[in-house]
Design a protein with these regions (language model features):
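Hydrophobic faces of well-ordered beta-strands that scaffold small-molecule active sites
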Residues: 19-23, 42-44, 70-73, 90-92, ...
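Glycine-rich phosphate-binding active-site loops on the catalytic face of alpha/beta enzymes
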Residues: 89-104, 177-186, 235-253
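Conserved N-terminal beta1-alpha1 strand-loop-helix module at the mouth
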Residues: 1-70, 76, 106, 152, ...
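N-terminal amphipathic alpha-helix/helix-capping segment at the start of soluble metabolic enzymes
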Residues: 1-22, 134-148, 204-205, 209-212
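Conserved, mostly hydrophobic/aromatic
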Residues: 21, 34, 45, 90, ...
């Protein structure tokens, strides 16, 4: 089995409804639990999480061993090393323009042979990495598989990003556009109240524009009501968060029968 799992890109390019989970806890065991719970893929969160590169690599191994695709949310300057770890996709925050999205595509894709057609990237090539099986699966085959099969998800999290959603989604090489409701609410002056009407209206515009452009529209959906509403607006990739689910379960367990037994 090759280390690089390219199934996520295929799923994002299909019309499937996908349920993902952000995990910022630096633990391969948590990744395994996400797989066993039945999520379609895991988003290892290296924007807000505390995992170093070695732990990230182990989490990618855990996902691969469990048969679950994995992407990594990371900052732009970490793209090259994250891809070399063997991530099947990357998710980049705070993309506001089509020009920025195009630059990210160039960083994710390898250069093409002179006689080939398609997106011409600028990713540096090395076959000693986990992504290439430490050389076992290097060469042109690895380059072609990576260019075709590594997913790029960009995040829009500001009014500017929402206004440019259609143009961002239209960029060749962008597989999905994810609306970040929390930062969008902050950037609109609503703190983290993304349920406020102006924020919801912006989300509706963004999701609709992405879907109309023929790309997969994603969003954080923490309740069934949110998921149903966002699906009606064009989303088909929904994400939740490990820490939120764990804390909710912990609180329920900690309360136990206190309310009824009065102790």
């Amino acid at each position: 089995m090759r280390p690089l799992d390219t199934r996520l890109a295929d799923a994002l390019r299909s019309q499937l409804t996908l349920r993902a989970i952000f995990n910022g806890i630096p633990s391969p065991a948590i990744v395994e639990m996400c797989a066993f719970a039945g999520f379609d893929f895991v988003l290892i969160d290296n924007e807000h999480g505390s995992a170093d590169l070695q732990t990230t690599e182990h989490m990618l191994r855990a996902a691969r061993a469990c048969g679950m695709p994995a992407a990594v949310r990371c900052l732009e300057h970490d793209l090259a090393r994250t891809l070399d770890l063997g991530a099947g996709g990357v998710q980049v925050p705070m993309v506001n323009t089509a020009a920025h999205a195009s630059r990210l595509v160039e960083q994710v894709k390898y250069p093409l042979p002179a006689d080939a057609s398609g997106v011409r990237g600028q990713r540096g090539s090395a076959f000693s990495t986990r992504a290439a099986g430490y050389g076992a699966f290097g060469g042109p085959e690895h380059t072609r598989a990576s260019n075709a099969g590594v997913a790029l998800i960009v995040m829009i999290e500001t009014p500017e990003g929402i206004a440019n959603a259609a143009d961002i989604a239209a960029v060749d090489g962008v597989d999905a556009v994810f609306v970040g409701p929390n930062d969008l609410a902050h950037s609109m002056g609503h703190d983290n109240r993304w349920g406020d009407a102006p924020v919801q209206q912006a989300i509706e515009r963004g999701l609709g524009a992405i879907a109309a452009a023929g790309k997969c529209a994603g969003i954080l959906a923490l309740t069934l009501d949110e998921e149903q509403r966002y699906a009606a607006w064009g989303a088909r990739f929904f994400a939740t968060v490990t820490t939120g689910l764990i804390m909710r379960a912990f609180k329920d367990a900690a309360q136990g029968g206190r309310a009824k037994l009065d102790y």
